[in-house]
Structure formats: structure tokens, C-alpha cells
């Protein structure tokens, strides 16, 4: 019984706020579940690409043009490195400063940038540079994220690269202008070279898959809101 000097509890504002909050939190949780399914399918596709037999550059290019995800597609081709135009990208090597070595190559009518792997800083001027036609095997990488917020500007003239800019790299390569620019970087497989340096990394995706954790968080907040609202009601 409510005494004359007491005000009735304001139930409806709490109910309305709870319903609105639950709708938002459940929607966000459901969206993360959908994103989880999409990300798992994408990662499965990348794994299938990496496990499939290698194809030549033109076949991989046509796959991408037809709408297939060509990331991590394995390629094998014969190409000739332009060793006087190698590029260095600031990187790390075994917890210390290192470099990623990129070498332009001409192959099958394409101008290709090949990621040959990493080396420690002290080996920058002393690494293997194979001459003549080479059997090259690697995986395709789009590297399309562009310049990060804190990344310095690339310096092609000073051969100092901080982020991936494939058109600029091909332009700086000095390869013949009649070669078609290949729209992917070819990352060498460790099994494709016997050189000590540069040393290729095992190809792996840098795609994060945190959607399950996010979904649990949103649904957990929805349950918490429901419990708190029930306590006050």
C-alpha cells in the first residue's frame, strides 16, 4: 500500500529504457554472430587457397578478375629479378630491427613485386641476389590497407618504404614500361629458396577474428541489463 506522502515508483521509464537497451545490445550481438560466420568462411577460403596446387600468374589474375578471392593463392612461374632495383621495407627480425626485401621481377609479361623475406639489419648489404631466370613459387598478397595513421611517407628515391604502395613500387622498379603491373605482391614460400638471407616467412593471415568474444560481450551486457532492471522493478 502506498502511503499518502510516498510517490509511486516510476516503472514505465525503466521498462522503456530496458527494452530499448536490450534491443540495441541484442542487435549488436547478433551482428557479431553474423560477422563471425563471415570471418570463418573467409579464413577457410584463404586456407583452401594456400593448400591448392600452384597456378601461373595469369591464371591467378583471371581468378581475381572473375571475382574469386585471390589472397593466398599459390603461384609458380619463371621470372628474372631486377636485382639493382631491390627495395627495403622497415620490419623486425627475431625481436630486433630488420628489413623486408622486395625485388622487382619480370615474368610472363608482368611486372611483379616479390617479397623475398626478412633479414637482420646488419645483413642489409650482404644477401643473396640470384641472377638469370628463376623458378619462383609463392602466394599472392593484396596488401591493400594503405598508409597507417602513424606511418611516415614512403621515400622511393631514398629506397625507404614503410607501408605497402604497390603502384608506387612498380613505378620505382625501373622494369620495362611494356610489362603489365601485377596487382598482387608475390610472397615467397620458405621452401622455394635455399638462400640464408633474406628468409621468407611462413604465409599467414593477419586477419583478427574476435567476433565471438564481442558477441559474448554484447549478449552478456544484455543479460546484465535485464538483471539490474528486474532488481529495480
Predicted features and spans:
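Surface-exposed, charge/polar-rich loops and edge strands
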Residues: 1-233
Amino acid at each position: 500500500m502506498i502511503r499518502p506522502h510516498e510517490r509511486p515508483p516510476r516503472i514505465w521509464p525503466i521498462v522503456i529504457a530496458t527494452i530499448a537497451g536490450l534491443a540495441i545490445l541484442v542487435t549488436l550481438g547478433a551482428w557479431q554472430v553474423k560477422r563471425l560466420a563471415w570471418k570463418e568462411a573467409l579464413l577457410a577460403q584463404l586456407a583452401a587457397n594456400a593448400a591448392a596446387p600452384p597456378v601461373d600468374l595469369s591464371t591467378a589474375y583471371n581468378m581475381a578478375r572473375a571475382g574469386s578471392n585471390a589472397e593466398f593463392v599459390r603461384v609458380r612461374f619463371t621470372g628474372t629479378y631486377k636485382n639493382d632495383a631491390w627495395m627495403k621495407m622497415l620490419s623486425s627480425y627475431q625481436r630486433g630491427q630488420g628489413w623486408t626485401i622486395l625485388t622487382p621481377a619480370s615474368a610472363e609479361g608482368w611486372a611483379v613485386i616479390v617479397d623475398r623475406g626478412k633479414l637482420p639489419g646488419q645483413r642489409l648489404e650482404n644477401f643473396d641476389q640470384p641472377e638469370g631466370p628463376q623458378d619462383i613459387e609463392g602466394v599472392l598478397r593484396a596488401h591493400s590497407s594503405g598508409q597507417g595513421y602513424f606511418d611516415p611517407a614512403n621515400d622511393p628515391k631514398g629506397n625507404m618504404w614503410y607501408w605497402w604502395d604497390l603502384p608506387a613500387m612498380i613505378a620505382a622498379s625501373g622494369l620495362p614500361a611494356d610489362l603489365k603491373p601485377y596487382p598482387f605482391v608475390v610472397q615467397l614460400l620458405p621452401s622455394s629458396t635455399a638462400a640464408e638471407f633474406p628468409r621468407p616467412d611462413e604465409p599467414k593471415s593477419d586477419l583478427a577474428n574476435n567476433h565471438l568474444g564481442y558477441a559474448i560481450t554484447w549478449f552478456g551486457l544484455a543479460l546484465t541489463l535485464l538483471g539490474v532492471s528486474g532488481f529495480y522493478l
